[in-house]
Swiss-Prot record:
GO terms for molecular function: 23S rRNA (guanine(2445)-N(2))-methyltransferase activity; RNA binding; rRNA (guanine-N7-)-methyltransferase activity. Belongs to the methyltransferase superfamily. RlmKL family. NCBIfam families: PRK11783.1. The gene is rlmL. Keywords: Cytoplasm, Methyltransferase, RNA-binding, rRNA processing, S-adenosyl-L-methionine, Transferase. The keyword Zinc does not apply. InterPro entries: 23SrRNA_methyltr_KL, DNA_methylase_N6_adenine_CS, RlmKL-like_Mtase, RlmKL-like_Mtase_CS, RlmL_1st, SAM-dep_methyl-trfase, SAM-dependent_MTases_sf, THUMP_dom. This is Ribosomal RNA large subunit methyltransferase K/L. It holds the Pfam family RlmL_1st. Specifically methylates the guanine in position 2445 (m2G2445) and the guanine in position 2069 (m7G2069) of 23S rRNA. The lineage of its organism: Bacteria, Pseudomonadati, Thermodesulfobacteriota, Desulfuromonadia, Desulfuromonadales. Its EC number is 2.1.1.173, 2.1.1.264. CDD domains: AdoMet_MTases, THUMP_AdoMetMT.
Amino acid sequence: MDAPIKFFATAPKGVEPLLADELRALGALEVSETRAGASFQGSLETAYRICLWSRLASRVLMPIAEFSAEDPDQLYAAVGAVPWEEHMTAAGTLAVDAQLRRSKINHSRFAALRVKDAVVDRFRERFDQRPSIDLERPDIRLNLHIDRDQATLSLDLSGDSLHRRGYRAEGVLAPLKENLAAAILLRAGWPDVGARGGALVDPMCGSGTLVIEAALITADCAPGLTRPYWGFAGWLQHRAEVWDTLLEEARQRREAGLQQLPCMIGYDRDRKAIRAARENARLAGLDAHLRFERCELEDLQAVPDAGESGGLLVTNPPYGERLGEVDELRSLYASLGEKLRTHFSGWQAAVFTGNPELAKHIGIRAHKLYKLYNGALECRLLNFDIAEQRFFGADAPQAPLSEGAIMFANRLRKNIKQLRRWLKKEDVTCYRLYDADMPEYAVAVDIYEDRVHVQEYQAPASVDSRQAERRLREVMRVLPEVLQVEPEAITLKVRRKQKGSSQYQKLDRSGERFEVREGNCWFLVNLTDYLDTGLFLDHRPTRFMLQAMAEGKSFLNLFAYTGTATVHAVKGGAATTVTVDMSRTYLDWAQANLRLNQLSGPQHRFVCADVLQYLEREQAHYDLIFLDPPTFSTSKSMETTLDIQRDHVDIIRLAANLLTPGGVLIFSNNFRKFRMDFESLPELEIENITAATIPHDFARNPKIHNCWRITRR
């Protein structure tokens, strides 16, 4: 059996989790999600199948060589050492794409030119003949990716972006790429709706991309079946017999699938758009199965052929760029909402928009919100259940807010105003807005970009539980209005004092991890599955301090949690890192965070171990150590319990023993009554740096943590 080959699939930003699931379903192994794509392993047949069947990938890349490329000459030499005669003939054609990040070579076209020169010169020197350049349909297309002067040179098996299915009529512009349209449909739940015979309607279909992609999904049609060109067709190692077998299988599945398509209709007010949609459907071989008709939104009616299965209304309405356009579009979104309420009761709906404010005029509460990107534009997909209880104004009249709730709302507004300038100046997107500022409303409100995390502090026994519940209901009523978010964007959790293993207590496995940014780092957070989210907001300055200290250093991260400090250290130029935690769940999360930032490598190790046992046996020394233990901990994996006040002398001494000469230990914990035992650590220089590590959004709570800079005397 052949050894698995490494590949990388690119995808639109925001689609990565869906892509990873799709790759696994298509037989890929060792799938690892990163920003704008996913790496995986498999056979060449697996890669062919993904090229043919992936609805979400943009390109499928097969790395040929990895090397350092600190200057153009080093790049040229490394590319020239690749045996290109194994991949193409001297009479063949090639093209080169290049993407550079944090590279000393700072011009992508120049880098691509040096790759081309190296390939061509190798053929000229060895065969006295050189390949020619074909930018449109070369025999092989190469992809050069350089990050931090480390280069990966890959064969682009797709040849052209996979969103080009081959059915878009020439000269027809589309606001959505086909793979983004497929992602919208998957997030909207169309596969389940279509499988049960539900109808699909797009009332503003444009050139028909959403309707056609929906038909390809439900009819089990391989999206690549109509493509005229592939990047592996002229590759010398192409296995034509494997590809032909996959094509034949796809044709048979398509023929069977087309027999069971439900009612699928696209409407648009523009006659040119309808003509384009019909032509696209013809090129996709679906014209006999889809309907495209001219219809104003105001004239939209119920679909008579929908049957009892209901269906999905999905659309990408215009969202305007100029002020006048936005004003006009408010009535369009309101009209869409009126049609949904009047004619599509019992259906599901999905609206993809680059202006979420306009979507509020639909007048129906979304039950799911997803962040996707249309090119560089951040957009939202809002999913709706068309049911009366979801309509704005359908709830029973609410009693006026109590005086306390009004004061809570005003405090939120005051905090927003006070933080606004600081947030902009420091480029902070995840922060604490409120932390029991009013003791009666004992919650912490954290903002994670466009989502809200609310933690209710457990009320003392002296507080009437019914009063506490009433105030919590008021909190949840006030937040959407003040923060201008949908209720579904708010996650509520009860926070209790940690006991034993509760710091790793799992809650509801309903949540998904999503990306947030912290300066130049990206992290995955999860607001529902655990008591904590994966990102301790109060340690933001500490992480940036570690990043500033890390260049060229060996870094050890102890009690590492999700590895956010490791990501900062690597971003700061740490030469090597070791990340230690006793939870496999959090170590896997830490590795995912490093991959998300495209920083993975053999120089960055992850160790699942009891930290105390690890410190006792570790022999290596480190220039920079971050030690952030819990206040109290015990688990089946630990031989003893950890009490930070009782045990801090021993654990600090063990960690400090691993410092190199001149090395620095940053020690932190969250025990509010912590007292450093200086007398028991005379060999160490210990400086309290807590004040410098408390961020502005936690200034009201300066005891949220304590932090110490420790060196050997």
